[in-house]
UniProtKB/Swiss-Prot annotation:
It is an enzyme of class 4 (lyase). FMN binds at residues 130-132, 251-252, 296, 311-315, 337. The lineage of its organism: Bacteria, Bacillati, Bacillota, Bacilli, Bacillales. PROSITE patterns: CHORISMATE_SYNTHASE_1 (PS00787), CHORISMATE_SYNTHASE_2 (PS00788), CHORISMATE_SYNTHASE_3 (PS00789). InterPro entries: Chorismate_synth, Chorismate_synth_AroC_sf, Chorismate_synthase_CS. It holds the Pfam family Chorismate_synt. This reaction introduces a second double bond into the aromatic ring system. Its EC number is 4.2.3.5. This is Chorismate synthase. Its cofactor is FMNH2.
Length: 388
């Protein structure tokens, strides 16, 4: 299973095409729209979220509420397009209009300058329009379909915010996937700790007041995962590696870790490895989950626990020093409309990309042509691993 996305931040809209979904899977536009709505929420979002009310148009691959096994095509309109029709026109425009909203002062930390160098764009709007996090809209749409597939197989995905601007949630116990969903949905910053939530919101407000931005850490948990997804036989078959790549591919994300993560470097092996247990009811389990559900690049049946770190958004309303590519003089960087903190929304994007990689691994391991046989094979596999 694979997908491609297309579209610019202020163009007519965003498109994604998914290939490889099994036939016969239940799927409605509402399954996607509810995830798009979640992405647009969160304390710290900018003015554009008051303009865009994302709704998906499914244009291919589904009939009467079920997938056909053919490519699924989806389109999300940019409501703000009406204000940018000339600037972002597909057809040539008069020279005076062509220079309108031209960007010649790249923003530090953004793709502007290097993208312009790479593709020869002397108007860096050609770079920022595609490198914008607006593209994650259709990544969330694709992830919504992956989450639907996993849900039908008894696999659930939930994300939450662990840290914003140095304020970290104090979680004194493990939360189930259902608890994470319920608690995070009720929080303006998708945090499971009410005390930390208030501090996070204050830090976001302070950053906005100062024309600054702040980043944070998100965590995604996947429950009900069967053992044996991914493989140890080749480096590129390891599922945790694929998930790490997916996390770091999200705009502004700079790292990923599983389970206890980098803390494993500070502990002896006896405090890191997860002891193996067995019972007739549950089969093989682990006493702890320090490795985040992976051993040898394969799922071990415990929940997948992965975290991603997001840097502050590069667009600052109090811009940093940059250089004009025309005159080579020092100026303040360009300012584009942006958020002061997008960490809560990024947790939804992280859910989507993790769900996608897990769904791909499921389809690689089991027959993916028909959804009814897929469900049967997954259940058979669960029983086999339990009895091993």
């Amino acid at each position: 299973m694979r997908y491609l996305t297309a579209g610019e931040s202020h163009g007519p809209g965003l498109t994604t095409i998914i290939e490889g979904l099994p036939a016969g899977m239940p799927l409605l536009a509402e399954d996607v729209n509810k995830e798009l709505k979640r992405r647009q929420g969160g304390h710290g979002r900018g003015a554009r979220m008051r303009i865009e009310k994302d709704q998906v148009q499914i244009t291919a691959g589904i009939r009467h509420g079920k997938t056909l096994g053919a490519p699924v095509a989806m389109f999300v309109e940019n409501k703000d397009w009406k204000h940018w029709e000339t600037v972002m026109s597909i057809e040539p425009v008069p020279e005076k209009n062509e220079k309108s909203r031209r960007v010649s002062r790249p923003r530090p930390g953004h793709a502007d300058l290097v993208g312009g160098m790479k593709y020869g764009h002397n108007d860096m709007r050609n770079v920022l329009e595609r490198s914008s996090a607006r593209e994650t809209t259709v990544r969330v749409a694709a992830g919504a379909i992956a989450k639907k597939l996993l849900h039908e197989l008894g696999i659930e995905v939930a994300g939450h915010v662990l840290e914003i601007g140095g304020t970290r949630a104090n979680l004194t116990r493990d939360f189930s996937v259902s608890e994470i969903k319920e608690t995070s949905e009720a929080s303006p910053v998708r945090c499971l700790d009410e005390v930390a939530e208030k501090e996070m919101m204050q830090k976001i407000d302070d950053a906005k007041k100062n024309g600054d931005t702040i980043g944070g850490i998100v965590e995604v948990v996947v429950g009900g995962v069967p053992a044996g997804l991914g493989s140890y036989v080749q480096w590129d078959k390891k599922l945790d590696a694929k998930i790490a790549r997916a996390i770091v591919s999200i705009n502004a994300f700079k790292g990923a870790e599983f389970g206890v993560g980098f803390e494993a470097a500070r502990k002896p092996g006896s405090e890191v490895m997860d002891e193996i247990l067995w019972s007739k009811e549950d089969g093989y389990t682990r006493r702890t989950n320090n490795l985040g559900g992976f051993e040898g690049g394969m799922t071990n049946g415990m929940p997948i626990v992965v975290r991603g770190v997001m840097k502050p958004i590069p667009t600052l309303y109090k811009p940093l020093q940059s250089v004009d590519i025309d005159s080579k003089e020092t100026f303040n960087a360009s300012v584009e409309r942006s958020d002061s903190c997008a960490v809560p929304a990024a947790s939804v994007v992280a859910e989507a990309v993790v769900a996608w990689e897990v769904a791909v691994a499921v389809l690689e391991k089991f027959d993916g042509d028909r959804f009814d046989t897929l469900k049967k094979h997954v259940e058979e596999h669960r029983n086999l691993t339990k009895e091993f």
